[in-house]
Regions:
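Dinucleotide-binding Rossmann-like beta1-alpha1 core, especially the glycine-rich loop
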Residues: 68-121
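Residues forming the flavin
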Residues: 2-87, 126-475
């Protein structure tokens, strides 16, 4: 039963209850008396259950992996990368580097407050630098980042505790409610519309996460908000035996290697390494992708990581988002509605994999809801060439990652094609309309998403205090 809506007007409305939305709501609740509403089209964190283990993917609408309080990060393995510039994240777009570093430190304090703390990586900085030195001898760069790992099994309770605290401070949460559009009058935002009616506010933070990227693009076009194209990353999820990654991951939990390919001179990189982890399915309704995660207590015999090739379209086609979606749809078609799984040895030999060939290998795939096939039928030639070239180069630094038995799942696509144009407070050309997190392209991981939410929250509080001060003076 849908609860009756008692209040329609708020000081601040936040669209999305992922890391950005939660941290924005927390900061507003902790540092002001403003009325705040958080709207998410998914469920509360502890009610989000993916049926894939029992029934396979039944294409829940919305997907419980991607939507709901905690966002897509809820079912990640909780890798926290405390760095101001990584991948599509670059906080120096909005502030000087010293302030960007301080903002990241501020997020860590909040994470710690709600028990989201863990072992710090690298465990040995000198050893990490030596690994980077050896990689650079092979023409490969390694980014050394302060990291913590929380575990997929711990995240839901942490997020639920944070949401409960925020609600206790007076923030209102609406679950299973989808935002359609914003209401604008004379260049200022005054509210929004959802499947349950209209709400009114002069301050709206748009933070729907990666799954909302396409919606944000259409929202921007409809309301005349400028956007810029930043490209996408397309590739595979690589799965190897733990023994191949053990020495490396004991020092650097999530090593990020950058490899420049020989034929096309494109950048490929590793991302989201999960030692003892599991490959997971992501359902984007019109197509499927893969991802990976790891628990703190439950471990598999395998390690997985994303291996991605960067794509930036310019002329005549600039819509990187649409290009990525077309790849996702084609790959899903080839896989019969499922991701495609292939042994690396089969890919190199130009033949499709079969379950018999996979079973005869020593790596047992952690995601079974797949179709054994040929990734070469699903990914563009340039991307596939980059991935094979890059993996062979990476094998010089991590011997064994390019073995015949290595498993590849496709597609893995990181959508950050569109970045909404904002000022340094992440406010758009529409007064009172702010952006935060992965969806509008201003962040690319859990920590940076939370950091970008603090920026508009601080601006809103400052503006409210200034308005209050002016009213006091006129009395």
């Amino acid at each position: 039963m849908v609860p009756k809506i008692k209040k329609r007007t708020f000081d601040v409305i936040i669209v999305g209850g992922g890391p950005a939305g939660l941290f924005g709501a927390y900061y507003l609740a902790e540092n002001s008396n403003l009325d705040v509403l958080v709207i998410d089209k998914g469920k509360a964190s502890l009610k989000r259950k993916c049926p894939i283990k029992d029934k396979g993917c039944i294409k829940c609408k919305p997907c419980n992996i991607l939507c709901g309080i905690g966002g897509a990060g809820l079912f990640s393995d909780g890798k926290l990368n405390f760095i101001h510039k990584l991948g599509k994240t670059d906080l120096t777009q909005f502030m000087v580097e010293t302030d960007a570093r301080a903002l990241i430190d501020e997020t860590e304090v909040i994470f710690n407050r709600f028990g989201m703390d863990g072992k710090v990586f690298p465990t040995d900085i000198d050893q990490a630098r030596q690994i980077r030195k050896e990689a650079r001898k092979c023409g490969i760069d390694l980014l050394i980042i302060k990291q913590k790992h929380l575990g997929s099994d711990n995240l839901p309770n942490h997020i639920a505790a944070m949401a409960d605290y925020i609600q206790g401070k007076g923030v209102v949460f609406h679950h299973s409610e989808e935002v359609y559009d914003i209401i604008v009058e004379k260049g200022c935002v005054v509210g929004l519309t959802t499947n349950r009616g209209q709400y009114f506010s002069n301050n709206i933070i748009i933070a729907p996460g990666r799954v909302g990227a396409e919606w944000i693009g259409s929202l921007a076009r409809k309301n005349g908000i400028e956007v810029s194209q930043r490209g996408i990353e397309v590739g595979v999820r690589v799965e190897v035996h733990n023994e191949i990654m053990q020495d490396l991951c004991s020092v650097i939990y999530d090593p990020t290697f950058f490899v420049r390919t020989n034929r096309y001179d494109d950048q490929t990189r590793t991302f989201c390494t999960n030692f003892g982890g599991f490959v997971a399915l992501e359902n984007y309704q019109n197509f499927v992708c893969v991802n990976g995660h790891a628990y703190m207590d439950r471990k598999s015999n395998n390690t997985n990581f994303a291996f991605l090739s960067k794509v930036v379209l310019t002329d005549p086609v600039e819509d990187n988002q649409a290009y990525g979606e077309s790849i996702g749809k084609l790959a899903t078609l080839i896989g019969g509605g499922k991701p495609t799984l292939q042994r690396y040895g089969d890919l190199k030999r130009g033949r499709r994999s079969t379950w018999n060939r996979v079973r005869n290998s020593y790596i047992d795939p952690t995601l079974k809801n797949v179709t054994c096939g040929d990734i070469a039928m699903a990914l563009p030639e340039r991307i596939l060439t980059n991935l094979v070239d890059g993996l062979e180069q990476l094998n010089q630094v991590i011997p064994g990652v390019a073995n015949d038995e290595t498993l590849l799942y496709a597609p893995e696509i990181k959508f950050f094609a569109t970045q909404v144009d904002t000022d340094n407070n992440l406010e758009t050309a529409i007064k009172g309309l702010y952006m935060a997190g992965d969806g509008p392209g201003v962040a690319g991981n859990i920590v940076s998403a939370t950091a970008t939410a603090l920026i508009p929250a601080k601006k809103i509080i400052s503006a409210a205090a200034e308005t209050s001060s002016k009213k006091m003076k006129t009395k």
